[in-house]
């Protein structure tokens, strides 16, 4: 994790991950989580990996069964975007990853992730994702 990428008005406001490390997905999902006081979402990647945790929580909702402890229920995953390109599933643990960068701007709440993926078949593709949880509309998660 890097904490020194911001400049100008964003100096000391950017948290960054500059390489894809499947064994550290959970750490980044937690550190870069997004929320607005009503809704919170772990910053899982758009594609699924073994061991990643996809959670979205809504304040004021509770789940209990029998004698179990009451806990926040995990609502539907609206972030997953599994992608197939020429029949190949986007999977950064296969092929080659270049120019990987995931950042969270703590001042604006914008999560961004970009990378170049060279698939096992040799296709070279550039990806860029953006995500935000709205402060103005507490029920809105936006992803591009």
What are these regions (language model features)?
Residues 2-144:
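Beta-sandwich/jelly-roll carbohydrate-recognition scaffolds of carbohydrate-active enzymes
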């Amino acid at each position: 994790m890097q904490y020194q990428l911001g400049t100008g008005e964003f100096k000391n406001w950017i948290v960054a991950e500059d390489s894809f490390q499947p064994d550290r997905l959970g750490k980044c999902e937690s550190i870069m989580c997004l929320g607005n006081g009503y809704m919170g979402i772990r910053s899982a990647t758009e594609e699924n990996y073994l061991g990643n945790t996809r959670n979205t929580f809504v304040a004021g909702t509770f789940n209990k069964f029998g004698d179990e402890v009451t806990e926040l229920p995990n609502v539907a995953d609206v972030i997953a975007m599994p992608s197939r390109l020429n029949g190949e599933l986007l999977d950064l643990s296969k092929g080659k990853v270049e120019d990987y960068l995931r950042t969270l701007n703590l001042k604006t709440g914008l999560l961004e992730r970009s990378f170049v993926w060279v698939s096992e078949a040799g296709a070279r593709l550039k990806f860029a994702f953006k995500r935000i949880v709205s402060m103005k509309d507490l029920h809105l998660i936006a992803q591009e």
